[in-house]
Regions:
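Short, low-complexity intrinsically disordered segments enriched in A/P/G/S/L with frequent Arg
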Residues: 2, 12-15, 23, 28-37
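ALDH superfamily catalytic-core signature
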Residues: 19, 265, 270, 292, ...
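Non-catalytic terminal/interface segments that mediate subunit docking, oligomerization
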Residues: 75-111, 116-122, 126, 151, ...
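Rossmann-like NAD(P) dinucleotide-binding subdomain of oxidoreductase/dehydrogenase enzymes
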Residues: 165, 193-348, 475, 541
Length: 563
């Protein structure tokens, strides 16, 4: 069905409003679809307080064997073809593309459909039609789907871990942390939905009954990244549908397999067809169709700055038949810095920078891309950082002993190596790495790279590299270090290592990032512990994993009745 042929239907939000306004049995009744109070003794009301899922340490031999078996099982399914899922129906596209193991670029893990613009439109229209019924489902019931999905995810945990080891090149612990974060999002957002569903407090006045409650938006397009392909995908998607919206989910073409595993979980818990629709393919071929469709109400995106800004621009253009201002929730990366003060534990600082710079090959928006070191300890810190980096094992991460795996694809590898070349041409001093790893195998492996004597305005001091490269910048003193830290267009994460309370407090006031860490690394945010999102070109400061996050997928409605 073309855009011009779309059924008029009820506009987004109207179905729920109709339900609210035509089912009143009293002045404060009739909003069961979003804010019905759970029945006493129901499963949702008996939920324990939220607690983060613990990551495996894989010291137990039985657990290691189970993980190796899970990896073998995923490898045994390599080459399988997967369909689009639209309205619960499995649909073919216009040909297929493969998702590959970056540790072994000859291994095709799965074949995925290339969705066409027409299929993208069909997915939006299906989600739009489903919204009328899904938006009427009580909040408690919607939250229960998240809790059930979390339980299935726990049961399939090693399978999900193994998929990310093979598809994204995560080491075992990084992969398991990704799965744990996905479980955390499900458990936390389910509880948050129950909280938002309760009556909201208002000031009372004589002669009126007043209420304020939240209703969903409509159809959302969810575009997650490949680097946290389960955690961020699950967080973005579950937040959108637990609030009563329907979703078109378009995973990255570098991580469709783990996204498809999540769809299997949603099918297993019997989430109604059409609530989440799964389309794969090139963002260039279907992205504009999804974002620009007049029935798209919001876009939730995590990815690069340039793609994010393109989404913001397209979403701002009103399409024929569009009756709302589209909402965009965007996280777009960072150029994150760790400041190393003259008065600090340099051994701890070197370990923290190594982990934050090179964990998951530096392919985190929160990664330490810059180490800004006060002059007095600059040379000593460099010596310690190089020594720490020399301990890193590089190789295929299906083997537990390898800590640093491959970068995601050839395009990423070429880009990272180009940045390393530019860094040296602009005056940087190569201290470690700087080239592909010769011993690692048939994958996209780059040695962990340290470039010293970088200037703040150098290319590698400003641009996000998204690879295992740490630019080290010398600062005259602590004040200069904070100035340098703020001297980029980004503002996502940052850290300060210092023994001086006054300097930590200065950083608290002046280091302009959404997530600031003191005397620890700048990576590793936990749900409901470190609400995550950044300033400036890092995005809309959406604070995933926070008690504000679900509001981004809701709109408030006030109703007053004279009595």
């Amino acid at each position: 069905m073309s855009e011009a042929q779309e059924p008029l239907g009820l506009e987004a939000g109207a179905a729920l409003e109709y339900h609210c306004l035509t089912n009143h049995t009293g002045a404060r009744r009739g909003r069961a679809a979003l804010s019905e109070t759970p029945k006493k003794g129901s499963m949702s009301t008996m939920k324990q307080p939220f607690k983060n899922e613990a990551v495996y340490d894989f010291k137990d031999e039985k657990l290691r064997k189970d993980m190796r078996d899970a990896i073998a099982k995923v490898e045994a399914e390599a080459g399988k073809e997967y369909d689009l899922i639209i309205g619960g129906e499995h649909v073919k596209g216009d040909g297929t593309f493969g998702t590959r193991n970056p540790s072994n670029k000859d291994q095709v893990l799965g074949l995925f459909q290339k969705a066409t613009p027409d299929l993208a439109r069909k997915a939006i229209e299906t989600a739009d039609a489903t919204f009328e019924s899904w938006s009427r489902v009580p909040a408690e019931e919607r939250a229960e789907y998240l809790f059930k999905a979390a339980e299935v995810m726990r049961r399939r945990r090693l399978e999900l871990d193994a998929t990310m080891v093979l598809e994204e090149g995560k080491n075992w612990v990084e992969a398991d942390a990704d799965t744990c974060e996905a479980i955390d999002f499900l458990e936390f957002y389910g509880r948050e939905m129950l909280r938002y569903a309760q009556p909201q407090p208002l000031t009372e006045i004589p002669g009126e009954q007043n209420e304020y409650f939240y209703i969903p938006l409509g159809v959302g397009v969810v575009i997650p990244p490949w680097n946290f392909p389960l955690a961020i995908l699950v967080g973005m998607t579950s937040a959108a549908f637990v609030t009563g919206n329907t979703v078109v989910l378009k995973p990255s073409s570098d991580s469709p397999l783990i996204g498809r595993k999540f769809m299997e979980i949603l099918e297993e818990i019997k989430l109604p067809a059409g609530v989440v629709n799964f389309v794969t393919g090139s963002g260039g071929s279907i992205g504009n169709t999804l974002v620009g469709h007049p029935r798209t109400r919001f876009i939730s995106f995590t990815g690069s700055r340039d793609v994010g800004l393109g989404i913001v621009e397209l979403a701002a253009k009103t399409q024929p038949g569009q009756i709302w201002i589209k909402r965009v929730v965007a996280e777009m990366g960072g150029k994150d810095a760790m400041v190393i003060d003259a008065d600090c534990d340099l051994d701890m600082a070197a370990k923290a920078v190594k982990t934050a710079a090179f964990g998951f090959q530096g392919q985190k928006c929160s990664a330490c891309s810059r180490a800004i070191v006060v002059d007095d300890v600059y040379d000593e810190f460099l010596e310690k950082l190089v020594k720490e980096t020399e301990t890193i094992t590089v190789g295929p991460v299906k083997e537990q002993e390898n800590w640093l795996g491959p970068v995601i694809n050839q395009r990423a590898m070429d880009s990272i190596l180009k940045y390393i070349e530019i860094g040296q041409k602009e005056g940087g001093r190569l201290l470690h790495g700087g080239k592909p790893s010769e011993a690692a195998g048939n994958g996209f492996f780059i040695e962990p790279t340290i470039i010293a004597d970088v200037k703040s305005r150098d290319t590698i001091g400003q641009e996000e590299i998204f690879g295992p490269v740490c630019a080290v910048i010398k600062a005259q003193d602590f004040d200069d270090a904070i100035r340098i830290a703020n001297d980029t267009e980004y503002g996502l994460t940052g850290a300060v290592i210092s023994d001086k309370r006054d300097r930590l407090e200065k950083a608290r006031r002046e280091f302009h990032v959404g997530n600031l860490y003191l005397n620890r690394k700048c990576t590793g945010a936990l749900v409901d512990v470190h609400p995550f999102g950044g300033f400036n070109m890092s995005g809309t400061d959406s604070k995933a994993g926070s008690r504000d996050y679900l509001l981004l997928f809701l709109q408030g409605k006030s109703v007053s009745e004279k009595v």
